[in-house]
Amino acid sequence: MEVLAAETISQQERLQAIAEKRRRQAEVENRRRQLEDDRRQLQHLKSKALRERWLLEGTPSSASEGDEDMRKQMQEDEQKARLLEESIARLEKEIEELENADTLPAPVKETQVAPSPGPVVPAPCPAQEDRKAEVDLNAQQTPVGTPKEKRISNTPMRMVEGSTMMNAAMYSVEITVEKDKVTGETRVLSSATVLPREHPPQGIKVYEDETKVVHAVDGTAENGIHPLSSSEVDELIHKADEVTLSEAGSAAAPETRGPSEEVVRTTPSRREITGVQAQPGEATSGPPGIQPGQEPPVTMIFMGYQNVEDEAETQKVLGLQDTITAELVVIEDAAEPKEPAPPNGSAAEPLATEGSREENQVGPEAPASDPQDLDMKKQRCKCCSIM
């Protein structure tokens, strides 16, 4: 009976220890949330004060009511910033105390058991049961976001919980950021994935959780370093991914153009065409399978039929609506030895020379008064249409 009573007492103590541990974890989570909110408000107040100070420096020396109001607002913001800094320091101290309280070993209580004639079952040590219960609680009922790992290392290697074996980091990312002192916005300049190093660069650790460790390396003295929250780290990683994708897209465009330009430079011209100048890229601009001497295929798209019955509509469709038609009729007389030249001297000159050549050939054989000669002269009359 005494053994059962001792087991009951140890079980009650174990349950009390579990409940106390849950309460401390809940307090730690609440203080962490409040700490992140205070840091965010402090950052906002600092950026606001910096902007107002910059505006006041640019105004003329003559004071006005607006400047006085702005100075009062700046003093109030500075007072709020001091209060927030004190609150942040207090919360950090409380969180550290609660976390140290979790790591302290539980006091070992000895249970006196009276001797009995029967076999005595050794009572389990409460400290061992408490540790076992804490491990089971961490494995099954740990709330989301609770830090399980208390040890902080200065290298990319991380300790596996419950053992002395180290878990090496899979990869490292170097991110170059620039912070606007006026707006407080952080902009990512470049991002590069590198192999994890055994000894990290000399810097300040600003964030660490179960999967990530963030060190601030350069610019620590100029910009001032404060610990980052999980949301800020996630936003920084997201911006770095966007910069990496944009750099990869800009680098892929010259690579796709490079081989075609080299082919154009190294391919000799196999055929010489008079009057045609080869342009760069003509050999590779056409579809595959077409030789340089062949013409590229023409794609024709059927747009439909159009019925035209009116002659005026036909000329309109064909683009001949504004054309002028003229006829030139030349009638020769037997008494005239020479044809009159046309006014412009362009259209009928070849015909006149041809007619005079025929007269020279036919003249000695037949007289000018022969009716057959008149018929031939009439047949030589030409009509031309000027479009």
UniProtKB/Swiss-Prot annotation:
Q: Which residues carry this modification: N-acetylmethionine?
A: M1
Keywords from the named record = Acetylation, Cell membrane, Cell projection, Cell shape, Coiled coil, Lipoprotein, Membrane, Methylation, Palmitate, Phosphoprotein, Prenylation, Synapse
Pro residues: bias regions: 116-125
On modification after translation, the UniProt record reads: Phosphorylated.
* Positions of S-farnesyl cysteine lipidation: C384
Q: Where is the composition biased (Basic and acidic residues)?
A: 25-41, 69-78, 258-273
Job of this protein? Involved in plasma membrane dynamics and cell process formation. Necessary for axonal and dendritic filopodia induction, for dendritic spine maturation and synapse formation in a palmitoylation-dependent manner.
- Cysteine methyl ester-modified residues are where? C384
**Coiled coil residues, start to end:** 7-104
Chief localization: membrane
Q: Name one GO biological process term.
A: synapse maturation
Question: What is the designated name of this protein?
Answer: Paralemmin-1
Annotated region (Disordered) at 22-78, 98-133, 246-297, 334-378
Q: How does it sit in the membrane?
A: Lipid-anchor
Q: Does the keyword Phosphoprotein apply?
A: yes
Please list the residues that make up the propeptide.
Answer: 385-387
InterPro entries from the UniProt entry? Paralemmin
Keyword check for Phosphoprotein, yes or no. Answer: yes
PANTHER family tied to this protein? PARALEMMIN-1, PARALEMMIN-RELATED
Q: Where in this protein does the record say Phosphothreonine is found? A: T142, T146, T244
Sites of the modification Phosphoserine? Answer: S116, S163, S246, S346, S369
Covalently lipidated residues (S-palmitoyl cysteine) read: C381, C383
What family name appears in the similarity comment?
Belongs to the paralemmin family.
Q: Where is the composition biased (Low complexity)?
A: 286-297
> Mind naming one GO cellular-component term on file for this protein?
postsynapse
Q: Where, subcellularly, is it found?
A: Cell membrane; Cell projection, Filopodium membrane; Cell projection, Axon; Cell projection, Dendrite
